[in-house]
């Protein structure tokens, strides 16, 4: 889900996205990990990121990831937003928890957002090198996980 407004989301996907698409009827919402690409002109500022955080909390999803576009084509290069441009830690009630960077290949960090006593887990991820995929999927000996988030289990 790359935008909080269904009309704008429909524009991004170039097709109509019905509002009921985010109802998640019959799905254990605690297992959902919402991912939002950072795209210039859409989610590209602290204000837009906060609206996305608030929408995620309103839906009841426990975690969201903001992911930078990889430089794989002209569109991605022209619409790239660096994680630092979002200034996630400038948003009130966002708290840094940990970071794992892989030099020039990967920038990853985790945060928590608290709104009215409701907690939202946030991860920020940007792979600058499209050929770099180390730690994208991790097997911890018991579960297959995406990234370094402890509770992000792939079924």
For every predicted segment, state its role.
Residues 4, 39, 70-71, 143, ...:
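Short, solvent-exposed loop/turn segments at secondary-structure junctions
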Residues 7-20, 25-129:
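Radical SAM enzyme [4Fe-4S]-AdoMet core and its adjacent flexible, acidic
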